[in-house]
Amino acid sequence: MKSVCFYFKIHQPYRLKRYRFFDIGNDHYYYDDFADDEIITRIARNSYMPMADTLLEMINRGNGDFKCALSISGTAIEQLQMYVPECIDKLRQLADTGCVEFLSGTYSHSLASLEDPEEFMREVKAHDDLIYRLFGRKPSVFANTELIYDDDIAMLIASMGFKTCLTVGAKHVLGWKSPNYVYRACTAPKLKLLLTNDKLAEDISMNFNNPEWDEYPLTADKYISWIASLPEEEQVVNLFMSMDTFGSFLPAGTGIFEFMKALPVFGKEMGVQFTTPSDAVAKLKPVDEISVPYPISDIDEARDVSAWKGNELQREALSKLYAVAERVSLCDDRRLKQDWEYLQSSDHFYYMSTKNMADGASHAAFSPYDSPFAAFTNYMNVLADFLVRVEEQYPESIDNEELNSLLLTIRNQAAEISSLKKEVTSLRTDVMNAEEKLPETPEATAAPAKPARKPRAKKAETAAKAEPAAAKAPAKRGRKKAE
């Protein structure tokens, strides 16, 4: 029986406000809160929430037969919590069904896997911790930013304990091979790979509402029949796409939600089931290994990383940003680290692309800037202020090794002080407990003594008091006789 593995991605960056050269050193807040609020509220109401309701209906109608996977960046979660908290509740409902697998990824949808392995691993941990806190699910399958992958990244992913990774079925990598199998990484044989079927995924995301497409209109029964007619040995079809495709790029009026709801119905008729990545790799064995010496991604026609690193503007911005990665990781300034997280989002570099033709149109459609050069200038102004703040924390005159040594000493001393404080507190508690257990002394148990009577005056004192009285008495009698 053939399986379809749907993977839906949710991501939103923190958009930068207009930041001029004269703001450097004076304004340390970089974000366009109004744009973030407006965009994520609109997309959540038009896309994320209706799609979540659609998936819930598909799951409930089939008594749990429909399954899929979901990937949400940390920055998207933060914005949903701030502006559309009811959307988080919808996602929790999906998690509670047990039919939706939450995937691992980078917190800010960053390019750290291409620039800094340590920062990449830190981001993945931060993302997965957030997913666990919110949805009670610990991700075990990895999906990198826009499915970026190569042989070196495979080793990093495997070293973090992941057994499965999703990536793109790029033609220049697969050659004559089909993406509809489970593969393994050549540099990490225990890491299983699920590759997206670009053609079938684009038939929904790109062609569903295209009247010039030769297969228009696309219906659920037609789509499922294409999958069912694939060669018998091709057992898994991976369809990876952005969740805002549904309701935003393909508005509800196109019938996209009804199309999705009908898929499980026709799937049951034609022997096609729906699965999660974990279930797919549990049932199917890898048929071959895949070697990817150069990075691939799910963006643009070339299926490489030129969308973010294709020109000097992008490479310069990335180089400047990640040059301070180690220093930022060593600091304890919460606000500085938060800005570091947000400035890593791949979207900032995507807006700087100078590509032409179809790729260029796609970049321009998503960009809030008038041109790639405006995107670069604004980002570099923000980055300049950020670097000034990093310099204030840790001057460049101190090299990283010396800085690391000093900070390690400070942290060790802080840990020792904390340990000693705990020891003092423990000793005080022990002393108090010991005092309570001591037996009471006889004096403490004896009845309280009656108050002492006033002591009698000594005889000498009595006589001394009597002498003046005696002296006065005879004198009085003598005066009477004289009279």
Where would I find each of the regions flagged by the language model?
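Alpha-helical scaffold elements lining the catalytic groove of polysaccharide deacetylases
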Residues: 110-133, 195-231, 252-253, 309-317
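Short, charged, surface-exposed secondary-structure boundary motifs
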Residues: 113-115, 173-181, 203-205, 286
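Short, well-structured secondary-structure segments
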Residues: 3-8, 14-17, 21-116, 140-143, ...
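Active-site and substrate-binding clefts of carbohydrate-active enzymes
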Residues: 1-46, 181-191, 195, 210-213, ...
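Acidic, His- and aromatic-enriched active-site or binding-groove loops in soluble protein domains
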Residues: 87-104, 125, 137, 158-179, ...
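An acidic- and aromatic-residue-enriched active-site/binding cleft used to recognize and process polar
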Residues: 8-13, 73-75, 107-110, 136, ...
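Generic structural signal for well-ordered alpha-helices
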Residues: 52-56, 88-92, 121-131, 154, ...
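Intrinsically disordered, polybasic Lys/Arg-rich low-complexity tracts
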Residues: 429, 433-483
